[in-house]
A protein has these predicted regions:
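C-terminal regulatory/oligomerization modules of transcriptional regulators
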Residues: 1-22, 75, 80, 97-131
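Residues within the DNA-recognition helix of helix-turn-helix
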Residues: 69
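The DNA-recognition helices of helix-turn-helix-type DNA-binding domains
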Residues: 47, 61, 73, 113-116
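Amphipathic, positively biased hydrophobic alpha-helical segments used for protein targeting
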Residues: 33, 44-45, 88, 103, ...
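Beta-hairpin "wing" of winged helix-turn-helix
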Residues: 74-94
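N-terminal helix-turn-helix DNA-binding core of bacterial DNA-binding proteins
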Residues: 19-65, 85, 92
Length: 131
C-alpha cells in the first residue's frame, strides 16, 4: 500500500501556505538548497574530508563558495568541523549524527540518477533507430 504524505489543505501550487515557515519540505529545502550542498554531503558519507580533498572532488566550485556552503551546512547542524592543533593547520569536515540521517535520501537520489540516466539513454537509442 502506498504511503500517503500529509499535506496541509491550504497548500496549493498557486498560493502560499499559511504553514510555510514550519512546513517540513520548506525546512528540508532550506538546509539543502545551494549549488554544492548535496554533493558535499554525498562526498562526506564515506569518511571525513579535509577542505582541499573536497575542493579536488568539486573542481568547479570556488574556494569562497565551498567555504560558504560548508559554513552553512555546519550552522544547520549537518556537518561538523574539527580543527586539529597541528602546524600546518588541519581541518576535517564530517557528517554530524543528524547529517548522517540524510544518507538514505542521498542514496535514493543516486539510485534515481542511475535509473533516469539509463532511461534517457534508452530513449535516445530508440529515437536514433527511428530516424
Amino acid at each position: 500500500m502506498k504511503k500517503t504524505i500529509p499535506i496541509h489543505k491550504e497548500c496549493h501550487m498557486n498560493t502560499r501556505c499559511s504553514h510555510f515557515q514550519t512546513c517540513p519540505i520548506t525546512t528540508f529545502h532550506k538546509i539543502i538548497s545551494g549549488k554544492w550542498k548535496i554533493l558535499i554531503l554525498w562526498y562526506l558519507t564515506n569518511k571525513p574530508l579535509r577542505f582541499s580533498e573536497l575542493k579536488r572532488k568539486l573542481p568547479d566550485v570556488t574556494q569562497k563558495m565551498l567555504t560558504n556552503q560548508l559554513r552553512s551546512l555546519e550552522e544547520d547542524g549537518l556537518v561538523l568541523r574539527k580543527v586539529y592543533p597541528v602546524v600546518p593547520p588541519k581541518v576535517e569536515y564530517s557528517l554530524s549524527d543528524i547529517g548522517k540521517e540524510i544518507i538514505p535520501l542521498l542514496e535514493s537520489m543516486y539510485n534515481y540518477g542511475v535509473m533516469y540516466t539509463e532511461n534517457i539513454n534508452k530513449n535516445k537509442d530508440k529515437l536514433k533507430l527511428a530516424d
